[in-house]
């Protein structure tokens, strides 16, 4: 989910670096430097990826929100990013986008750091994937060993959760929060 899960030393363990809303309530409404992008679901069901500053004008209408790292695409255009080792190197990546109509969410999980299986992606590669998938806005979430996709499997009266990808950390890394996709019945 959110970028990094800084260990707070408190009994609850990890703390989200970015904004985090659940069911219309702010769990965390401030963002650390560098974590200034937000994915949110509005009361009308529309979805957005916006800057922290833009989020301030819509937060009262927000049901769910999750902070993010770098913006990859803003209003249909690739965003320029800084040239540094993290952005130019191949790493496991987790990123997401929304379509122009603000109705469709696209989620991407890319394994990496596993020679012979997957090297990962660079920032530029993520932008190309988002453009090809039709993302109008997109942002980078936490990657590296935090890149994990879990699927709920129902078997009779029981449900189990299975890891669908091959995380580079083994076992899966503890994180502060995540993005849960739920079908309302």
Identify the residue ranges that each predicted region occupies.
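Gly/Ser/Thr/Pro-rich low-complexity, intrinsically disordered segments
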Residues: 1-185
């Amino acid at each position: 989910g959110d970028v990094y899960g800084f260990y707070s030393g408190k009994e609850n363990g990890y703390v989200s670096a970015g904004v985090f809303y659940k069911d219309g309530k702010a769990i965390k409404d401030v963002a650390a430097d560098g974590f200034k992008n937000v994915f949110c679901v509005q009361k009308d069901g529309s979805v957005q990826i916006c800057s922290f500053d833009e989020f301030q004008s819509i937060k009262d209408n927000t049901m769910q929100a999750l902070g993010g790292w770098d913006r990859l695409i803003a209003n249909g255009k690739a965003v320029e990013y800084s040239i540094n080792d993290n952005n130019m190197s191949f790493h496991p990546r987790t990123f997401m986008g929304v379509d122009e109509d603000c109705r469709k969410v696209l989620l991407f999980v890319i394994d990496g750091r596993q020679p012979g299986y997957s090297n990962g992606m660079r920032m530029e590669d993520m932008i190309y994937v988002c453009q090809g998938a039709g993302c109008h806005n997109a942002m980078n979430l936490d990657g590296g060993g935090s890149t994990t996709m879990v699927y709920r499997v129902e078997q009779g009266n029981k449900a189990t959760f299975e890891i669908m990808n091959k995380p580079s950390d083994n076992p899966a890394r503890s994180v502060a929060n995540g993005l849960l996709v739920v079908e309302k019945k």
